[in-house]
């Protein structure tokens, strides 16, 4: 979690965090990101009105959970969590999942 929050603005660092995950965790996350990448295609956004920012806002709390009980920390990290997920949707290469999804 802390690495995700620390690298929420850097596509290269965010992708490196994903590649450092255990294989099964990485595969599940890549599957989810691939699914979200399908949704952010312009034809789908035109119908759903769910662009990359909206999807990141909805999905970030399901992927990243702040361990702090301090509301200020939780509030500050929420923006970083959404940014991290948005970066992954925009930059993570999930082409190897092509036949799976």
UniProtKB/Swiss-Prot annotation:
This is Rho GTPase-activating protein 39. Preoptic area and testis. InterPro entries: Rho_GTPase_activation_prot, RhoGAP_dom. The record marks 1 as: Arginine finger. Residues 1-96 form the Rho-GAP domain. It comes from Rattus norvegicus (Rat). GO terms for cellular component: glutamatergic synapse; postsynapse. GO terms for biological process: postsynapse organization; signal transduction.
